[in-house]
């Protein structure tokens, strides 16, 4: 059987952490962050989401990075498989169900007691996908996920600062929340450095557990399409003894250039290579897109990895940026 070269997976996740006021702008309000993952997934296949009538936006109205993934796919037509890692709602499109578990608020209780079951199921899926694809590119949509990622990285002993979908990265709030979680568990930074699954169980989210399982089950090349959240996955893989030479992170330059985060340093410390999508929205006629250049949104829904697939298919980052402009114009016309 002939395998497909690359299969794009979009893993959806929710965590109660996203409802802490001020921590996530991956939704117009903290409550709406619960719907963001399913809306992102639906928008990849339809003119607009089905669960909610508009695409996810930040409180200031900046469009979801799903628009980049959709643009790249419209150009290069790669196959997409949506995976429900653990969300409040099921997306109204065909998808693989791993769990309906939502990550708990780790200040109060362990975030993911179901970690083993989720990893096991995702591993099984990864093994099956190996029969049909040479490579998988895994993106994610998980509001609040940069906080869970930073908590895991800290628990494993990395001095990491993760990015945010806002130019005002709520780093102080993130650190306060993480420290409260560490206090509950009774650890300092690095306190779980030899216990990766414990770190994931205490502070993680279902997306990270699902991506970890997929990565362990699939024996071919894996592109982790995301910013600082995929650094947490990489750190867990390394800690579990995986050889990172078959892995690569694909992200956008907005994550790499984020002065409030440590993407390059942390990737180097973990020892994983990265591809950076050189997208540029500075000449867009829409403020919602131009503001990506001011540090809004940055990455998500596998935007960097989807751009990488389009580039591999012979398109340029400029082509992707142009297509994004077109899609945004179409959206504006639908209102």
From Swiss-Prot:
InterPro entries: Nict_dMeBzImd_PRibTrfase, Nict_dMeBzImd_PRibTrfase_arc, Nict_dMeBzImd_PRibTrfase_sf. GO terms for molecular function: nicotinate-nucleotide-dimethylbenzimidazole phosphoribosyltransferase activity. This is UPF0284 protein PH0034. Gene3D superfamilies: 3.40.50.10210. Belongs to the UPF0284 family. Coiled coil: none annotated.
